């Protein structure tokens, strides 16, 4: 293949889908449970079937794909299992909104069966879109093993786990104060509640004593819940109220007398030191009410209104009830005052509704028995968490575990596998088989199944097991790939999901679900606020925001800030739009380069453009190389490379590649994805293209060396390209595969043989069907002499000096100039000359014993080496003028510093650190001045 056959530009729009079909059609994503390769299994965090993928999905799946491609190339039997999550609350809410908008109907307008048909239809449509988008990302999943959290196998697993825990006493049903979402009308687990700080009020209300004219004043943030009060609590050590403990007060409006109790948990400094106790609507009050055997009176309906226990306020919305209660209290002389107060309000993570503590009969998992095992897995490093900072978060959460509420008042989800006898609600059957229990089948009119479903996280908590075939203990996948090697997920669901997988999977299998966990940060994008003269602001979006994202200066009144991605803030970045604009490889490289190991990932929009340019650089660099290896054949690689024919620059690039491989091994082992991306990027751009290729161009074009050296360079260049494509493949699979297949096509059929230390691994790679199946590159088995490393380091420093001189004198980079070097030992410099000429833009270099006495040149110094560049007279005069200005500036600076440091008063009174800093500045200015004087002397 010649450069004429090689397109000038990389067409990712056509290439990416073609290559994905090629990989999938040839079964390159499939895992074999019967393989004797070491297993490496990963389960995909299943995206919800609620809509399309967002940038968080793009990140987590890119990181997984980078790892599985690397492990596949490293000789592992890789099993990456994709799947989707039924996402009970989220999906039901989305479908309800859809049906209300499209058909004007609510969920309750359908039968349960008909409503579920609508959700299944939604699931099928949404899942198809999600899986298609995962393919666009280049995910090399084993699609034949795709799972869904509500498929029959998952349902069997859920029922098996529920029954096992139930029969062992770890699942129970009871009344408890749950987190109630009044919009979705379901209970939520503690970690499904998000907390916000809001401005509110602290209300002071008077309660009259029974049989007395006295009264007690309490402070509360929720006066409407007084309808459910069953006690007033004070500290037993508070002398103000000591004599009142045991007395009773009247609850306004509901004709109820309640006791005043003493409880050590009451803070005497809060409010008046007396608090009302509403056990059915406050978690602290619930515990207090339980300890003091107080009645628990629920005053709320499932939708958050006031129920029949609310007296004259029954039937009102709670907000309206609060207004009416405050008015009525004031009319009766029971309202004292209100004062501003900061509230910590619980909010549903799904609906955004304010959470109500709500007394309800629910199913729970008792977690106290599992605490020890959950700690031991991580403390013993049987499960390793990366980054390590999250270990303490995990252990802290485990130490404060509360029983997990697993029942949800929804229709979409795994139905709780429990049947109740209609005449005795405590008589239950727990069943994990197909269909219904035999006892129910024999007498169906006497039994009914629990209408609730299980928390989504219950089925997700079994995901590593169900993906591999459990509860079938003889599943080949389970035997080969469990426990899984790694879980990659966001740190925000460490408690939602990761810990529950450890709990459920270990209790079912007796083994950990995974060996390592990598928790990535959450993606933040730049948002822009525009402020007006009154301090009011609004978010900027559209083309104006894009201009700022791409680097346009912000005008006055516009402020930028990194914030979580949010449509309302205008900083959402659609991964599919980025793929369409910049290509999948550019998106993957961008995400990897940002994936540091912190809690926040700042996604700079400009990186997409930068990595698109890099992809073009890879294409153009490969195209240049193809132009010089197009007539290369497999036998040339088989013949190998004569080490004696290698030059300094060859050892440099080989040494650089070896260092790259070692650095990448460390980066992959520690999940430093940002280093994986940037190390490969910098090697290709800086070391291979900008340095090595530039150095050897004269040889490639026949201007230096002989035919043998030209052949060596061409062969080594081909070997380097093959290996670098392998290194880049996990992060940029499409462009690397396209180029790899072109190399295979160029070289044709490969003869038998192993090659040598330089070409052997490249030959093994080329014998693979594709780059993604090729063995991952290894360090070249060649020793790089230390003196050669030092010589190239010297060459780099000299090149820097040359470029600095050219830059200072503003010399045209295309202008090839003559130079000279003065040094005591010319041996080392001799080997550097081709490098200095190629990278410094020099026509020739003379080795001299001393500087020319006169001449139009400018020079620099590296250690004891003086390097001069002969320049045209007009440039030299310009440079002389610049140096004269620098001389005047530095002489004044030295004079001022000498005067200051010669002042005894200053040296005695000034801060010692300041004196030292001035002394250091004087020293540096003197050195710089002497250098300027030396250069000026050469112009004399």
From Swiss-Prot:
Subcellular locations according to the entry: Cytoplasm
Family under the similarity heading: Belongs to the class-I aminoacyl-tRNA synthetase family. ValS type 1 subfamily.
UniProt KW Mitochondrion keyword: no
Entry protein name: Valine--tRNA ligase
Record-listed ATP binding positions: 567
Keywords: Aminoacyl-tRNA synthetase, ATP-binding, Coiled coil, Cytoplasm, Ligase, Nucleotide-binding, Protein biosynthesis
Any one biological process term the GO annotation gives: valyl-tRNA aminoacylation
Functional description taken from the UniProt entry: Catalyzes the attachment of valine to tRNA(Val). As ValRS can inadvertently accommodate and process structurally similar amino acids such as threonine, to avoid such errors, it has a 'posttransfer' editing activity that hydrolyzes mischarged Thr-tRNA(Val) in a tRNA-dependent manner.
A GO term from the CC aspect: cytosol
Regions annotated as coiled coil: 873-905
SUPFAM superfamilies: Anticodon-binding domain of a subclass of class I aminoacyl-tRNA synthetases (SSF47323), Nucleotidylyl transferase (SSF52374), tRNA-binding arm (SSF46589), ValRS/IleRS/LeuRS editing domain (SSF50677)
Span(s) of short sequence motif 'KMSKS' region: 564-568
Catalyses which reaction(s): tRNA(Val) + L-valine + ATP = L-valyl-tRNA(Val) + AMP + diphosphate
CDD domains per record: Anticodon_Ia_Val, ValRS_core
Subunit structure: Monomer.
Single annotated GO MF: ATP binding
Major subcellular location class: cytoplasm
Gene: valS
InterPro entries xref list: aa-tRNA-synth_I_CS, aa-tRNA-synth_Ia, Anticodon_Ia_Val, M/V/L/I-tRNA-synth_anticd-bd, Rossmann-like_a/b/a_fold, tRNA-bd_arm, tRNAsynth_Ia_anticodon-bd, Val-tRNA_synth_C_sf
Documented EC number(s): 6.1.1.9
Motif 'HIGH' region, chain ranges: 47-57
Stored Pfam families: Anticodon_1, tRNA-synt_1
Record organism: Chlamydia pneumoniae
Domain notes: ValRS has two distinct active sites: one for aminoacylation and one for editing. The misactivated threonine is translocated from the active site to the editing site. The C-terminal coiled-coil domain is crucial for aminoacylation activity.
């Amino acid at each position: 293949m010649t450069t004429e056959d090689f397109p000038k530009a990389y067409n990712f729009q056509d290439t990416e889908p073609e290559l994905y079909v090629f990989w999938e059609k040839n079964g390159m994503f499939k895992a074999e449970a019967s393989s004797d390769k070491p297993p490496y299994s990963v389960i995909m965090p299943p995206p919800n079937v609620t809509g399309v993928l967002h940038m968080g999905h793009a990140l987590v799946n890119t990181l997984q794909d980078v790892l599985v491609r690397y492990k596949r190339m490293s000789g592992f039997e890789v099993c990456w299992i994709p799947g989707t999550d039924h996402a009970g609350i989220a999906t039901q809410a989305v479908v309800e909104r859809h049906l209300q908008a499209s058909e004007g109907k609510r969920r309750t307008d359908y039968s349960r069966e008909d409503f579920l048909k609508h959700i299944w239809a939604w699931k099928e449509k949404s899942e198809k879109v999600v899986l298609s988008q995962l393919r666009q990302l280049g995910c090399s999943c084993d699609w034949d093993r795709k799972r869904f959290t509500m498929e029959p196998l998952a349902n069997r697993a859920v029922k098996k786990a529920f029954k096992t825990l139930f029969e062992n006493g770890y699942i129970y049903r009871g009344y408890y104060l749950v987190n109630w979402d009044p919009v979705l009308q379901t209970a939520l687990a503690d970690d499904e509640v998000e907390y916000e700080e809001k401005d509110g009020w602290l209300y002071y209300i008077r309660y009259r004593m029974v049989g007395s004219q006295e009264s007690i004043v309490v402070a509360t943030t929720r006066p409407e819940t007084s309808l459910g009060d069953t006690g007033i609590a004070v500290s037993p050590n508070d002398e103000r109220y000591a004599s009142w403990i045991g007395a009773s007060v009247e609850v306004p409006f509901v004709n109820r007398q309640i006791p005043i109790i003493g409880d050590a948990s009451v803070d005497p400094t809060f409010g008046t030191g007396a608090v009302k106790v509403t056990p059915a609507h406050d978690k602290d009050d619930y515990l207090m009410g339980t300890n003091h055997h107080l009645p628990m009176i629920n005053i709320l309906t499932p939708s958050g209104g006031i129920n029949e226990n609310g007296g004259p306020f029954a039937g009102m919305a709670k907000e309206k009830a609060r207004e009416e209660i405050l008015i009525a209290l004031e009319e009766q002389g029971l309202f004292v005052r209100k004062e501003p107060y900061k509230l910590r309000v619980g909010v549903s993570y799904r609906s955004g509704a304010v959470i109500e503590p709500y007394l309800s009969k629910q199913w729970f998992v008792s977690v106290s028995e599992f605490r020890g095992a959950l700690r031991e897995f991580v403390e013993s490093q049987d499960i390793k968490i990366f980054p390590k900072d999250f270990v303490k978060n995990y252990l802290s959460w485990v130490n404060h575990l509360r029983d997990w509420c697993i029942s949800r008042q929804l229709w979409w989800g795994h139905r709780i596998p429990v049947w109740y006898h209609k005449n005795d609600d405590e008589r239950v059957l727990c069943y994990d088989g197909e269909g219904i229990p035999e006892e129910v089948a024999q007498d169906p009119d006497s039994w009914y199944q629990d209408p609730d479903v299980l928390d989504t996280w219950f089925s997700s908590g079994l995901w590593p097991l169900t993906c591999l075939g459990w509860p079938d203990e003889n599943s080949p996948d389970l035997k080969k790939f469990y426990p899984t090697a790694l879980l990659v997920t966001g740190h925000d669901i460490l408690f939602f999901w990761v810990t529950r997988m450890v709990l459920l999977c270990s209790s079912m299998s007796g083994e950990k679900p995974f060996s390592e966990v990598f928790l990535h940060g959450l993606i933040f994008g730049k948002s822009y606020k525009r402020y007006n003269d009154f301090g009011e602001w609004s978010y900027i979006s559209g083309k104006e925001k894009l201009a700022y994202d791409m680097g346009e200066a912000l005008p006055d009144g516009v402020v930028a800030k990194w914030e979580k991605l949010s449509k309302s803030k205008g900083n959402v970045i659609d991964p599919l739009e980025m793929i369409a604009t910049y290509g999948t490889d550019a998106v993957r490289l961008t995400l990897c380069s940002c994936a540091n190991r912190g809690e926040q990932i700042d996604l700079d929009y400009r990186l997409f453009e930068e990595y698109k340019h890099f992809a073009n650089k890879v294409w153009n660099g490969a195209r240049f190389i193809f132009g010089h290896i197009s007539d290369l054949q497999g036998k040339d690689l088989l013949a190998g490379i004569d080490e004696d024919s290698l030059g300094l620059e060859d050892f440099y690039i080989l040494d650089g590649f070896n260092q790259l491989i070692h650095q990448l091994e460390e980066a992959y082992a520690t999940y430093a994805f940002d280093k994986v991306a940037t190390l490969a990027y910098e090697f290709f751009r800086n070391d291979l293209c900008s340095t090595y290729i530039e150095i050897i161009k004269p040889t490639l074009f026949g201007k230096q060396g002989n035919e043998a050296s030209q052949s060596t360079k061409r062969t080594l260049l081909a070997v380097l390209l093959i290996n670098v494509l392998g290194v880049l493949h996990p992060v940029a699979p499409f462009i690397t595969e396209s180029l790899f297949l072109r190399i295979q096509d160029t070289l044709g059929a490969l003869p038998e043989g192993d090659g040598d230390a330089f070409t052997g691994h490249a030959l093994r790679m080329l014998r693979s069907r594709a780059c993604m199946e090729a063995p991952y590159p290894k360090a070249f088995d060649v020793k790089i002499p230390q003196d050669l490393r030092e010589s190239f380091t010297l060459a780099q420093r000299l090149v820097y000096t040359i470029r600095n001189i050219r830059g200072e004198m503003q010399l045209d980079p295309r202008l090839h100039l003559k130079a000279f070097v003065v040094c005591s030992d010319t041996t080392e410099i001799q080997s550097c000359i081709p490098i200095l000429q190629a990278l410094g833009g020099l026509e020739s270099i003379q080795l001299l014993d001393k500087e020319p006495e006169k001449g139009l040149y400018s020079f620099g110094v590296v250690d004891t080496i003086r390097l001069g560049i002969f320049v045209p007279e007009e440039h030299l005069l310009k440079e002389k003028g610049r140096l004269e200005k620098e001389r005047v500036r530095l002489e004044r600076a030295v004079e001022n510093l000498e005067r200051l440091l010669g002042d005894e008063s200053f040296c005695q009174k000034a801060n010692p650190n300041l004196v030292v800093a001035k002394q250091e500045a004087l020293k540096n200015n003197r050195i710089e001045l002497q250098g300027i004087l030396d250069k000026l002397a050469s112009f004399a």
